[in-house]
């Protein structure tokens, strides 16, 4: 009986304090920057970060970084090999480690508002290496940065 009560108490604590176990905003944003824009220059990485931030502050999307990034069918980088590598930074090769550190720095600066939005409010993007998605035809193009084209949903 005592074990059962302890287990229930632990479960209750987990439910009440799930943010303790959730990824912090900087880490989860850095992961998606790394996974989606590892081959991009600084501005390309900043642009990907801003799309996530724009979604967090939009009424059309979830209001947390983690929920925006994990929203189904949104970011192909989630659960990619690059995404998974960020859980084990000591195993990153020197080039990947530099890119991961850059992603962390960019994530922090974007979240803190120290870098302006180069996408002009974009909340979507796609890579130029794929055919134009149907959704892009219904949106306003805001920028082309590196290998991504950025779009803003209609208000």
Give the ranges of each region predicted by the language model.
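Initiator methionine at the very start of the polypeptide chain
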Residues: 1, 22-23
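Bacterial N-terminal signal peptides that target proteins for export
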Residues: 1-7
């Amino acid at each position: 009986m005592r074990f059962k009560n302890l287990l229930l108490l632990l479960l209750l604590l987990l439910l009440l304090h799930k943010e303790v176990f959730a990824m912090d905003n900087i880490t989860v944003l850095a992961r998606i920057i790394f996974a989606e824009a590892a081959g991009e220059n600084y501005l390309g990485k900043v642009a990907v970060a801003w799309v996530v931030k724009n979604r967090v502050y939009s009424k059309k999307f979830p209001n947390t970084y983690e929920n925006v990034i994990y929203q189904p069918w949104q970011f192909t980088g989630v659960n990619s090999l690059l995404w998974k590598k960020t859980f084990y930074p000591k195993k990153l090769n020197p080039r990947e480690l530099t890119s991961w550190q850059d992603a962390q720095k960019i994530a922090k600066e974007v979240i803190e508002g120290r870098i302006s939005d180069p996408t002009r409010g974009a909340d979507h993007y796609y890579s130029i290496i794929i055919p134009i998605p149907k959704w892009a035809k219904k949106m306003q193009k805001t920028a082309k940065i590196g290998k991504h084209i950025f779009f803003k949903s209609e208000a």
